[in-house]
Amino acid sequence: MRKTLVACGFAMSALLVAASLSAVPTLVGKPAPDFALRSMDGKNRRLSEFRGQVVLVNFWARWAGDSRQEMPALDRINTTYNRAGLVVLGVSVDEDWRRAREFADAMKVGYPILFDTTADIGRNYLLRKMPMTILVDRSGVVRYSSAGFKSGDELAYLDEIRELLRE
């Protein structure tokens, strides 16, 4: 009897964890919140200025090890698909934009890096793990969201990007 109760307790715990994970809020299917952020070149950039293009927004932080892995993959994607209508934007959520800039310089990426030092934009995008990648379609709707990064995730990004570029 006791073993049965313990087993039921574990099963209920597993179900509650699974339910809570599936209930994580997402912006997929909703309009992407617009933002204006300062870029590394000193200009303010707005998401809305890229309306009509597919936009990959990657939220990252220098303290998130997965960001260091993901950025070169995103740079390759940017190089390959930029002329086809893809815009890649990296958004640092580090509080210290100077240290974030040093990190971005060291990563040598060819896409614009923006600074969200107050994390206000990150909150609007419901960030829950770093890095986080969002794909926005040509009409400004969030179509894909991925939290965290492991090698191979960029293949899922590519599938989504190709589909959005065909639309």
Where are the language model's segments positioned?
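Positively charged n-region of N-terminal signal peptides that target proteins for export
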Residues: 1-4
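Bacterial N-terminal signal peptides
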Residues: 8-18
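N-terminal "domain-start" segment that seeds a small globular fold
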Residues: 20-47
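Short active-site neighborhood of thiol/selenol oxidoreductases, capturing the structured segment around
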Residues: 48-65
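Structural signature of beta-strand start/N-cap positions in the alpha/beta core
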Residues: 53-55, 85-87, 112
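Hydrophobic beta-strand core positions in alpha/beta domains
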Residues: 56-58, 88-90, 134-135
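Structural microenvironment flanking redox-active thiols in thiol-disulfide oxidoreductases
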Residues: 68-107, 117-124
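Thiol/disulfide oxidoreductase modules built on the thioredoxin-like
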Residues: 102-110, 116-162
